[in-house]
Amino acid sequence: MAAKVCRSVLLLSRSSGAVASSAYPAFGVSSQRHQGTKTEALSMSLGGHQTVRRAHGLRTGGRCALFCHPSATLTAQGWKGSPSWQVQRLLCSPAAEDVSVVYQNGLPVISVRLPSRRERCQFTLKPLSDTVGVFLQQLQAEDRGIDRVTIYSADGARIASSTGIDILLMDNFKLVINDTSYLVQPPRRDLLPHEDGERLNDVKILVQQLYTTLRIEEHQLNKERELIGRLEDLNSQLQPLEKVKEELSKKAERRTTWVLWGGMAYMATQFGILARLTWWEYSWDIMEPVTYFITYGTAMAMYAYFVLTRQEYLYPDARDRQYLLFFHRGAKRTRFDIEKYNKLKDAIAEAELDLKRLRDPLQLNLPIQQIDTSKD
């Protein structure tokens, strides 16, 4: 009867010790020790080797409970006064992200921890106008310790520098700074509906027109200064060539005039000879066939001129042709660069035309002068 009572008390002590250790892990060790002492006292009354084994098993169970609850030991130390809970909180808290993307006032702000001084730097980008190349240039300009910086997509494909920031932030990407790679996960943003997209395009066009209207005067002044400077440069290059051209032109003009007067003298001499032979030396009956052949020979000469020059024999055209012949002969003799002279003249004419168009009343937003249709 006494042995049964001792066994029941032992079972109750085991169950109460387990409940206490599970509910109050901080007191698990003391409860196990108390239970072990109580068991040893009961084993002395029983006097059996089996009870000693049970007590040893309870001590082993107490040790298992101690090693299975590391938080209980830390909590017990915390109750003793050491700030282990703060250390545990620091070890368990996640590390700050090196690269993050947030939106502030509608603009993406990329925060990057620079490798030189390990400081976070924020880069505010314009999604519509900035590109990946602009962002990479800003990174290298901010930290001189960055030798290589590239951006890759999530599948490892390199993203071109001309890609827009709005396209880049649509999906995850990898930012590689020197030998360190960062996985960037930008926040998701809903795409605009079709109607809102059209309104946004209209706003873009309106802003561009407003910018053009406000900057048109400054642009025209800068363009006018540029054209005037170009004209001055071209004129300075043309001036020495113009002097040589004037000398050659005068010589060619003088020789052409001599040729014209020589033709006039030839025709006058021919008229005098034919008149002398017709009325003083011979009669008209004899000179008529001669004058016919002279006229026919002159017609053949004019036809030969057309065959050679592909131009009709007209006095102004013949005179200009003779002038050009004399001019080119003089240019070849003096090594005058006619091609360069013509290019400079064309460039000056084009610049003057652009300047005239720039100063047009329509370009300056001035009222147009009305055409007076009334007759005097």
UniProtKB/Swiss-Prot annotation:
It catalyses: Ca(2+)(in) = Ca(2+)(out). Residues 35-257, 310-376 are mitochondrial matrix. InterPro entries: MCU_C, MCU_fam. Residues 99-189 are annotated as: N-terminal MCU domain. Residues 281-289 are mitochondrial intermembrane. Residues 213-254, 336-363 form a coiled coil. It is a multi-pass membrane protein. One of its GO terms (molecular function) is identical protein binding. Residues 1-34 form a transit peptide. One of its GO terms (biological process) is regulation of heart contraction. MCU channel activity is regulated by the heterodimer composed of micu1 and micu2, which act as calcium-sensors. At low calcium levels, micu1 occludes the pore of the MCU channel, preventing mitochondrial calcium uptake. At higher calcium levels, calcium-binding to micu1 and micu2 induces a conformational change that weakens mcu-micu1 interactions and moves the micu1-micu2 heterodimer away from the pore, allowing calcium permeation through the channel. MCU channel activity is gated by emre/smdt1 via the juxtamembrane helix loop. Inhibited by ruthenium red or its derivative Ru360. Ca(2+) binds at residue 288. It is found in: Mitochondrion inner membrane. Residues 309-314 are annotated as: Juxtamembrane helix. Keywords: Calcium, Calcium channel, Calcium transport, Coiled coil, Ion channel, Ion transport, Membrane, Metal-binding, Mitochondrion, Mitochondrion inner membrane, Transit peptide, Transmembrane, Transmembrane helix, Transport. The chain crosses the membrane at residues 258-280, 290-309. GO terms for cellular component: calcium channel complex; mitochondrial inner membrane; uniplex complex. It comes from the Eukaryota. Its main location: mitochondrion. A motif (Selectivity filter) lies at residues 284-292. Homotetramer. Component of the uniplex complex. Channel-forming and calcium-conducting subunit of the mitochondrial inner membrane calcium uniporter complex (uniplex), which mediates calcium uptake into the mitochondrial matrix. Mcu channel activity is regulated by the calcium-sensor subunits of the uniplex micu1 and micu2. Mitochondrial calcium homeostasis plays key roles in cellular physiology and regulates ATP production, cytoplasmic calcium signals and activation of cell death pathways. Involved in buffering the amplitude of systolic calcium rises in cardiomyocytes. The selectivity filter, in which calcium ions are arranged in single file, is composed of two acidic rings separated by one helical turn along the central axis of the channel pore. Belongs to the MCU (TC 1.A.77) family. This is Calcium uniporter protein, mitochondrial. It comes from Danio rerio (Zebrafish). The lineage of its organism: Eukaryota, Metazoa, Chordata, Craniata, Vertebrata.
